[in-house]
Structures are given as structure tokens and as C-alpha cells.
Amino acid sequence: MFSFYFNDNKITKLLMVGYGSTGKSVCDFLANFIDITVDISQNDDEFVNYDLNSYDLITVSPGIPLNKSPYRALTKFKDKIVSDIDIFYQYIKDTKAKTIAVTGSNGKSTVVTMTDFVLKDLGYKSILVGNIGTPALNKIGEKFDYCVVEVSSFQINLFNCVRFDLGCIINVSPDHLDRYQNFEQYKQSKLNLAKFSNDFFVYDVHNGIKYAGEYQIIRGAIYRNSTKLLDIVETKLFGEHNLENIIVVLNILDRLGLDINQAIDSIKKFKGLEHRCKIVKKVNSTTYINDSKGTNVGATIAALNSITNSKNIILLLGGVAKGGDFSLMIKSLDKYVKYVYIYGADKEYIESYIKGYCKYQLCNNMKQAFELSSQKANSNEIVLLSPACASFDEFSGYAQRGEVFQNLVAQLEQKS
């Protein structure tokens, strides 16, 4: 066994703040080294008992709110703070593997998953890590050609020395305003990815900063200069927002020097993400769509704008609002939504934004919202779960929320 080094410095004492899946991955990795003491702070009371000056390094889990007491004390030790991705980078930086990092408010999970899918379909060894669910250090023992990393603003705030071969920002819209002073601070946290990337581009539909390279969208299809490459109907996806996602992936592959025509064939096979604008079933001529991964206002707006051209959506909205500005969706509500059922911990907060702009009803929970929506829905209408909120008031995460919705649809079908 060997000692643990970071930036060529021997580390003998490390404090781990937070012990979720990321913290556990760091702990498991450090178990491979000798001569290192690791202390773990799992809650506020434990944290205040540690002398931060006494540690060589401090790893912080992304879920730790650095803007709140007692964790504000960490801001004085910025040079000591590292993320799990910094540690991962230290041990792969001398390999030939290429690293690609993607951040954004909406679309980043689709972009990184599609990129990873295409790379594998083209015959490369690729790993997909980060905010998508798999900590990077869990893959440290694997051999790979490409590492695709989904990064959140919280992770970027913790970066110390990582250098990605390519960084990309897409679709920055208000989110996590419970962790940031304002939208500008949140947006800047995303833009800071550029500081940690050798190559970098922005494709931001919301703010009009779109590096599209040689690609453009014309009438539901992607063109490269004047050559048509792909029509949305040739894919297993739907909506212009997915054409935007494909353009981001094509630009990533371009910058990696890969064959775009072969990549197009791979993209046609990509089935999209679970819980992201997925048609569950048509029951009694009503279509039920699961967009549980729509955890902020921008994601729900994108869903509303891509699903229909008519005012025929019954929307299930609610959960933990994270300080979101629901007034931003008023235009889309007016154009596409027949009725809204609002549920969850922040239902009154949401109501305060949309009251007077649409027909709605407050509900106790998502199940009640579903039952009422299925009763109200008429033929050829759509019941859409796109909550624009986090799910932790009622569920373990967006995936469980989506699964519960799918089960409710299945039960409804059995009764029909």
C-alpha cells in the first residue's frame, strides 16, 4: 500500500464533511492508502467540534450548504477544500483518457447520457459519472477512453484543481435559489466551469448565447450547413428541446474529432431518459406523460412547450420549490394548460405566483392530484407530471416520484 498524495503533497489528515454516496466513495477510495487519518462529519453538531486548521485536506459533499451555518466556516479554508472529482482527476490526469464535463439547469442529464451512449455505440470505452448518480471514484479502477461527467453548480463550487478536456454549459435558468443569493450568483457558479476546462463552449437557449457550430434546427430537423442530418421523427425522442440537446452532443463529438455521420446513426437508437417526458400510457383516450425529472421551473416550461400545440394539458405541479420563480411559466400555462393541480410542501408558494393566470386546485399530495386529474381529463387530453420542484417532501427522489406516477397510471388502466 502507498501513502496518499494530492498535488504532490503527502496527505496525512483529512476531514470528510458529509457522508452520502459521494462521501462514501471518497472513504472507500482512501481505504487503499496508509498513513492517513480520515475524520467524518455527518451532521452539524459533529462539524463544530473539528479544528479545520488541523487538516491537510477537507472533502465536502455537494449537498452541504456552504451558505448556511455552521458550514460558512469552510469558506476560510478554500485552498484545503477538494471535491471527489478533484481526487479522481489526480489519478487519471496522466492517462490518455479524455474528460468531458457538462452543466446546466435543464438538459444536462440527457446530454451526458446521450454522449456516453454514442461513445459506447461507436466502440469506445466510456464511463458516465458525477451528478447523474455514480460518484467518479467508484469508477477509478476501470479502463476507459472517455469520462463523461455531469456536474452541478454545487460541485463546481468545490472544484480545486481538476482540468477537463472539454467543458460545456447548457440552458441556465433560475434554480436552487435557496442556496444562492440571486440568479446572477447561480449563473456565475455554472460559468466557473470554464476555469477548470481546457476547451469550453456555451449553448444556452434561454439567454441567447448559443454556440451551435455548423448546426441549426429547421422545421424539426438538424442541418449541418445546408445538409440535412437528422429529423426528430427518425429518433426515439420528441420535442425541439431534444433537437437542441442533440446539437450540443454533436458539438461535443466534433471537438473530440469523432465521425458525426456515424454518431447520427447512434443517436437514432438513443431512447432518452427515464422520467423525462416519457409517455407512460394512453388510458381512456387520455395520454399520461411522466416528466418527474422536471425539478425546476425551466424544465417544466421546456416540457410544456414541446409536448403539444393545443391547450389540452392537465398539469401536476408541486413539491419543494427551491425558491423557483413560477411567474416564468405563466405564458406557457396560458398557451398549453387547461388545468393545474398543485400539491406538496410549497403548494401555497406556487399558488401565489400563478393565482389569477390559470384554473387550478390545491391538493394534499400527488396521489390526490393524479386522481382528480384523471377524473377531469377528456378524450385527447394530456395529464402531465412535470412538478417543477424537488420531491423530498413526499418521495426519496424524482425517480421514486415518477415510479409512483407510473403505478397510478397502471392501476387506472386496470380499473378501466
Curated annotation (Swiss-Prot):
Biological process (GO), any one: regulation of cell shape
Single GO cellular component term: cytoplasm
Top-level taxon in the UniProt lineage: Bacteria
Coiled coil: none
GO MF term (any one): ATP binding
EC main group: ligase
Residues the entry annotates as binding ATP: 104-110
First-listed, main subcellular location of the protein, grouped into a coarse class: cytoplasm
Keyword Cytoplasm attributed: yes
Subcellular location: Cytoplasm
Pfam families listed in its UniProt record: Mur_ligase_C, Mur_ligase_M
Annotated EC: 6.3.2.9
UniProt catalytic activity: UDP-N-acetyl-alpha-D-muramoyl-L-alanine + D-glutamate + ATP = UDP-N-acetyl-alpha-D-muramoyl-L-alanyl-D-glutamate + ADP + phosphate + H(+)
Record keywords: ATP-binding, Cell cycle, Cell division, Cell shape, Cell wall biogenesis/degradation, Cytoplasm, Ligase, Nucleotide-binding, Peptidoglycan synthesis
Family listed: Belongs to the MurCDEF family.
Role of this protein: Cell wall formation. Catalyzes the addition of glutamate to the nucleotide precursor UDP-N-acetylmuramoyl-L-alanine (UMA).
Protein name per UniProt: UDP-N-acetylmuramoylalanine--D-glutamate ligase
The organism of origin for this protein: Francisella tularensis subsp. tularensis (strain SCHU S4 / Schu 4)
